[in-house]
Amino acid sequence: MSITLTDVQKDYSDKVQIGPVTTEIQSGGVTALVGPNGAGKSTILTMIGRLLDIDTGTITVAGQDVVNSPSKAIAKILSVLRQENHFVTRLTVRQLVGFGRFPHSRGRLTIGDEKYISEAIDFLNLTDLENRYLDQLSGGQRQRAYVAMVLAQNTDYVLLDEPLNNLDMQHAVQMMKQLRRAADELGRTIVIVLHDINFAAHYSDKILAMKDGKVVKHGTPAEIMQNEVLTEIFNTEVNVIDGPKGPLAVYY
């Protein structure tokens, strides 16, 4: 089972085009989408999640055609967290996480739904905050609550669009560790858009690099973390050195 894109294309204008993209993201582990601004990372992610229509091509997730399958069926195998989330701030953490069960409960939470909600809250270390309102949380706490919401949906595939945005170094590291745990301990397939190539290299199993709307490289961190590969992807000189916990890209 996998996420498969075949000749997927999105045209914004005669000069701005994403694709055609043909690639396969294997099930299991963490796959990071990297590349410069405007490369098409978020566009590809949101098309996989059916939040953005594709113009041509096909996308399948676990064998199901994303475009033609019923929304309810897709929502039971695939969850998505966008960059911008506009929820009512007077929701509590638990109420927010409960929205993740909507595809299953249709708004009528069962005992089973409450169990998944509690497990997601506990997994993201939010138990002490579950009755707090979102506007009473720090940015890092609020972002963890959103991730708990998509984990509570209990899908095999989880798509995350730049979840480290607006997080400081400490909270970004904590978030990546928790997503790594979700892949390793819960068996989720995590597909995540990241700006920091070093986070991608350390926490991902595979890296899919995009540039100018195309996939230019798809491989292991060891295959991507090469001077010439990163320099070509990011249009700036990058030197990869041996760090204490693996390769590090230096680009200052």
Question: Where are each of the predicted segments found?
Answer:
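The feature captures the beta-strand-to-loop junction immediately N-terminal to the Walker
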Residues: 34-36
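Helix-to-loop junction immediately C-terminal to a conserved catalytic motif
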Residues: 49
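Conserved ABC transporter NBD signature motif
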Residues: 57-65, 73-74
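Conserved ABC ATPase "signature" region
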Residues: 98, 111-129, 154, 159
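Conserved ABC ATPase signature
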Residues: 133-137, 141
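ABC ATPase nucleotide-binding domains
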Residues: 233-252
